[in-house]
């Protein structure tokens, strides 16, 4: 049994963590604002509010005068003036002054109120008149600032990879317009909006991509509180898109002459079943090379071929020649001799086996540990020991040098290198390999940037205490400040995360399927057949049903998980989710409609955690993406995302920091339960650069159809594994016969498990891998909108940990969108009136749904600065239909609460941390 439990007093993060740092300091976007226009808008709105109070008072006083007067001309004049005041319409000066004189003779108090309103309304009219010129001048200056930002080296380096088309337009865009203050034409405005989105992405968001966002390796240490300092100068690393290598390999294999020289092997893990040969067949669906982000989709399935004399003899040959190189051409010649058949027939037969994956060419695959994929590909070619392969490897030398020079090159040099790289890859395919039309992906390179933290921290293993830093370059976080701010609330919230884990129902279902087949304490030695039967008999149909399931129906009632096996653990999960929703609903109702914040207490979390008892694995290392809001007197830490797994924050960046993989490898020993080992599930050949990483586990599981990347002694074949149910612990245990130890599968890539082939995906149901998006408002009624059509959600926090940011939701029809004929200053003023009326902060992230927008922009939160007309215009361009709905979320932390600095200024940053997991004792 496991030693329980989550010790809330000692839980902390592992001393090594990652910091994701926005590429531009936040000060860079301040120049895009119109501060004087904002002050003008505030003054207008303040004066308007005061005038409304005066107008109400004056209206009442005039009402009394009208009712008490028999002078019909005076009554008509007073009625007209009262209507003007009610409609906030400034009357003509002469007529208003005459009426004011008459009122003064009748009621001095009313005259005083009326005089104040007229004076204020005339002053407001003058102030309103100043808005157009002021806004136009400041908008012009903000456009100049945007043009200046368009030349920022860090922005342009990333932009060249993210949007080459936009990058190519920016030099012309940066030139001053022919006439100062002229409104840009339609094409220029489109460029402006696209550029603005990338500027905000680089200054205000933290998703690593090239130099848009850098990463720094951090450690617990020092005594600087929550303040982090990163380096001003960044270093980058570029790698060729592995899809480009896949296209090269396809071209080599497609050429009969070169194919003859390629070593071949049967699909690993194949076996004989009576009159059939069984193996895992893998299908690869090529991605679209013309899209910016593409990778080849892979699926696998247990497959059978009818045994025949020819196939049996061929497989026997492979067995007899095990450990020696068998080339495709040699195999064709052997078949011709053995069968007495024509070479063409033998080519056709072997080609068919290649097509169905029974025979494979493994040497040209990119594997997860090929952290320099192009150099690895060259090495594989030279290992063929054939003149054409050496020549092809030599032809790839110039593209390889382009890749190596790219990271340190200027933006102009990068353009030339990309052009040379693309031309070189095309030439290799067309000139060297004879391809009619070269296949080269649109995105040729992927790049990551280090924002410091390259020095080795003293200890990368788990534990709450810090180790002294060995170099000043390491980003350091004060452990005492972290413990006080986040350790306890984060540990408490971790206890309820299984309720939100998207993979937990699948893990419970797989265990239920196993128990139905093998019973309590049962054992399965044929995992390949188990996985095949699970998918064939149950899981594929189950996934079809769950894909259409909505967690809550139209009435807000929770919809239970699909539970065809009648599993009590799934019912317990449903109960925990209902409990969470009921407690959140009660919390919301108690807070009232105007609440800005609600607090989840310990009792709330304890009640939900009690329902989850025994559902989650006892070995559950977690990773969290967090942002610190360093507010005076009330600092907060915001939980953005949570994942389960080992070394997840680091794996993608191991090649960026010297020695990081070795330190992480060593650190895992302290978190693995006694009697268990970690073994990586790779998912097979790499189809995305996101899956490249150094070695982080002592072992790897080699699935059928894979060849493995480690030395033989560290490979665990599927045949060596068996699955057994531990009735005492109530869990499934994967064990290795050779090692006589429990094996914990670990996935270190960045693709979602659903994108992996069937067999690795199923093995991960036995791993700590999880995805737990914390949607605290799921199933909680929104409540009625306010008079302006806006509904709100308060911020949700547990202690200093924010679980959900404050938000506002509105249909497009409720927004003060720019309408034909409206003035720019009037439109700007309307937005600030809207913001003020509904209590929105100055800066938010806006998510537009149901827009029909294409690409990532339509789905992701966009930074919106209400003080910038350029930002407002770019946001409005995302709203394509009247049916669109917008959710505004507070920018937390906002720019006044940022805790990460460099010599350039303050930076938006996000911490990627792993929570420390004490060693748990197990007996099986």
Which residues does each PLM region occupy?
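Elongated alpha-helical scaffolds
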Residues: 306-309, 326-327, 344-348
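Segments forming glycine/polar-rich beta-alpha architectures that bind adenosine-containing cofactors
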Residues: 244, 248, 253, 258-268, ...
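Short, positively charged loop/turn segments that connect secondary-structure elements
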Residues: 336-345
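Type-3 copper protein
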Residues: 1-238, 344-685, 857-924
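C-terminal structured domains
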Residues: 627-881, 886-890, 910-914
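Short, Φ-rich (hydrophobic/aromatic) sequence segments
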Residues: 152, 159-257, 744-806, 810-813, ...
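Short acidic, hydrophobic short linear motifs in intrinsically disordered regions
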Residues: 323-335
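Acidic, low-complexity/disordered tracts enriched in E/D and polar residues
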Residues: 2-12, 196-321
């Amino acid at each position: 049994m496991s030693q329980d439990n989550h010790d809330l007093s000692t839980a902390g993060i592992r001393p090594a963590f990652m910091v994701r740092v926005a590429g531009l300091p936040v000060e860079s976007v301040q120049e895009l604002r119109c501060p004087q226009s904002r002050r003008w808008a505030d003054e207008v709105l303040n004066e308007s509010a005061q005038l409304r109070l005066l107008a109400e008072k004056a209206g009442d006083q005039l009402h009394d005068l009208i009712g008490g007067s028999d002078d019909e001309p005076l009554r008509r004049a007073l009625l007209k003036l009262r209507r003007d005041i009610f409609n906030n319409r400034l009357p003509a000066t002469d007529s208003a002054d005459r009426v004011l004189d008459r009122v003064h003779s009748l009621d001095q108090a009313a005259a005083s109120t009326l005089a104040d309103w007229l004076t204020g309304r005339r002053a407001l009219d003058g102030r309103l008149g100043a808005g157009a010129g002021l806004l136009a001048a400041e908008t012009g200056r903000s456009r100049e600032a945007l043009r200046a930002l368009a030349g920022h080296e860090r922005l342009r380096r990333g932009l060249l990879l993210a949007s080459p088309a936009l990058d190519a337009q920016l030099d012309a865009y940066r030139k001053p317009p022919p006439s100062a203050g002229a409104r840009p034409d339609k094409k220029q405005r489109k460029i402006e909006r696209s550029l603005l989105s990338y500027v905000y992405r680089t200054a205000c968001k933290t998703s690593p991509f090239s130099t848009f966002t850098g990463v720094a390796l951090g450690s617990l240490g020092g005594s600087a509180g929550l303040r982090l300092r990163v380096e001003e100068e960044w270093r980058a690393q570029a790698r060729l898109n592995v899809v480009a290598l896949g296209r090269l390999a396809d071209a080599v294999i497609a050429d009969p002459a070169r194919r003859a020289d390629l070593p071949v092997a049967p699909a690993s893990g194949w076996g004989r079943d009576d009159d059939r040969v069984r193996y895992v067949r893998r299908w690869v669906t090529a991605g679209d090379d013309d899209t910016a982000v593409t990778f080849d989709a892979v699926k696998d399935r247990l497959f059978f071929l009818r045994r025949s004399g020819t196939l049996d003899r061929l497989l026997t040959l492979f067995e007899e020649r095990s450990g020696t190189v068998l080339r495709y051409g040699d195999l064709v010649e052997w078949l011709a001799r053995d069968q007495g058949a024509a070479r063409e027939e033998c080519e056709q037969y072997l080609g068919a086996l290649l097509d169905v994956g029974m025979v494979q060419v493994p040497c040209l695959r990119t594997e997860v540990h090929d952290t320099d994929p192009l150099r690895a590909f060259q090495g594989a070619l030279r290992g063929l020991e054939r003149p054409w392969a050496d020549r092809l490897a030599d032809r790839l030398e110039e593209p390889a040098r382009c890749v190596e020079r790219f990271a340190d090159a200027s933006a102009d040099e990068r353009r030339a290198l990309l052009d040379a790289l693309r031309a070189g890859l095309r030439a290799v395919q067309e000139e060297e390999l004879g391809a009619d039309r070269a296949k080269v992906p649109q995105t040729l390179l992927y790049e990551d940037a280090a924002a410091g933290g390259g020095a080795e921290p003293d200890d990368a293993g788990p534990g709450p205490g810090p180790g002294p830093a060995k170099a000043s370059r390491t980003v350091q976080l004060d452990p005492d400040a972290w413990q006080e701010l986040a350790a306890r609330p984060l540990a408490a919230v971790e206890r309820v995360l299984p309720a939100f884990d998207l993979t937990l129902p699948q893990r419970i279902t797989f265990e239920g399927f196993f128990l139905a087949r093998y019973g309590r304490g049962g054992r399965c030695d044929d995992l390949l057949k188990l996985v095949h039967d699970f998918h064939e008999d149950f899981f594929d149909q189950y996934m079809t049903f769950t894909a259409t399931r909505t967690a809550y129906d139209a009435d807000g009632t929770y919809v239970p998980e699909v539970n065809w096996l009648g599993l009590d653990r799934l019912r317990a999960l449903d109960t925990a989710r209902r409990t969470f929703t009921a407690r959140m609903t009660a919390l919301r109702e108690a807070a009232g409609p105007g609440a800005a914040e609600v607090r989840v207490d310990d009792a709330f979390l304890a009640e939900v955690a009690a329902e989850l008892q025994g559902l989650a694995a006892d070995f559950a290392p977690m990773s969290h993406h967090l942002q610190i809001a360093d507010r005076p007197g009330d600092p907060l830490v915001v939980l953005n995302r949570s994942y389960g797994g080992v070394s997840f924050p680091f794996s993608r960046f191991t090649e960026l920091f010297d020695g990081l993989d070795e330190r992480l490898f060593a650190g895992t020993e302290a978190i693995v339960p006694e009697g268990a080992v970690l073994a990586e599930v790779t998912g097979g050949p790499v189809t995305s650069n996101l899956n490249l990483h150094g070695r982080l586990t002592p072992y790897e599981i080699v699935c059928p159809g894979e060849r493995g990347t480690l030395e033989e002694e560290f490979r665990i074949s599927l045949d060596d594994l068996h699955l057994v149910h531990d009735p005492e612990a109530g869990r499934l245990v994967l064990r290795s016969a050779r090692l006589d130890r429990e094996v914990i599968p670990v996935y270190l890539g960045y693709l979602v498990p659903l994108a992996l082939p069937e067999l690795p995906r199923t093995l991960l149901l036995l791993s700590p891998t999880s995805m737990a998006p914390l949607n605290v408002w799921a199933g909680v009624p929104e409540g009625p909108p306010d008079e302006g059509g806006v509904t709100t959600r308060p911020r949700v926090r547990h202690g200093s940990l924010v679980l959900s940011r404050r938000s506002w939701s509105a249909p497009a029809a409720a927004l003060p969108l720019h309408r034909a004929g409206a003035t720019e200053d009037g439109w700007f003023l309307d937005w600030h009136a809207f913001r003020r009326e509904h209590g929105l902060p100055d800066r938010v992230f806006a998510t537009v749904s149901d827009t029909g927008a294409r690409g990532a922009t339509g789905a992701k939160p966009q930074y919106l600065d209400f003080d910038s007309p350029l930002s407002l215009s770019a946001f409005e361009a995302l709203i394509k239909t009247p049916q669109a709905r917008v959710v505004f979320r507070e920018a937390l932390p906002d720019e006044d609460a940022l805790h990460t600095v460099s010599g350039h200024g303050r930076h938006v940053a996000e911490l990627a941390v792993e929570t420390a997991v004490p060693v748990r004792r197990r007996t099986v």
